[in-house]
Amino acid sequence: VKLHDQIKEKIDDIKSIEITTHESAIRIISKVGELNNPADRDHCLQYMVAIGLLKGNLVAEDYEDDVAKDPRIDTLREKMIINEDKRYSKEYLEADKRSIANRIQIHFNDGTSTDEIEVEYPIGHKRRREEGIPVLEKKFKDNLAITFDEDITNKIFNLCMNQKELEETSVIDFQNLFAKKP
């Protein structure tokens, strides 16, 4: 995602994509070959990286069949080389760190490369909780807006942001906020 702006005009000039990660990621989500459905795609490191490079973000809809039909995704997946960094693997398992480190570098046909981009603790990791909460709140509100109009979206969102008011709301009243009116 961080490299999108830098490489978006050079997608066709990519020679290889070097991804360095930890053993658990390689074992669990590094997949080659055909991805048959959204569940396959959301458990594929290479698919997620390809979407991030192509779009600059990654949302739930990106795992659906209509997005997956883009031939550029598999072209990029085929150019990916996945390597293990032993330090990443060790720190992933260390209780005081639980690092989820990854690094990426893109190499082009003309011999140039991007800088290596390394993230040891991604947004959402407990060490980045303060940074992650606003991202999670935005994601929640954006997803509400997919289904509800602005008024209902704001009503649900604001209620959920006010713990005291939320705790005082009956389950029925809360559920009714989510009921689509005919």
Residue ranges and their predicted role:
Residues 1-182:
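Terminal-appendage/accessory-domain detector
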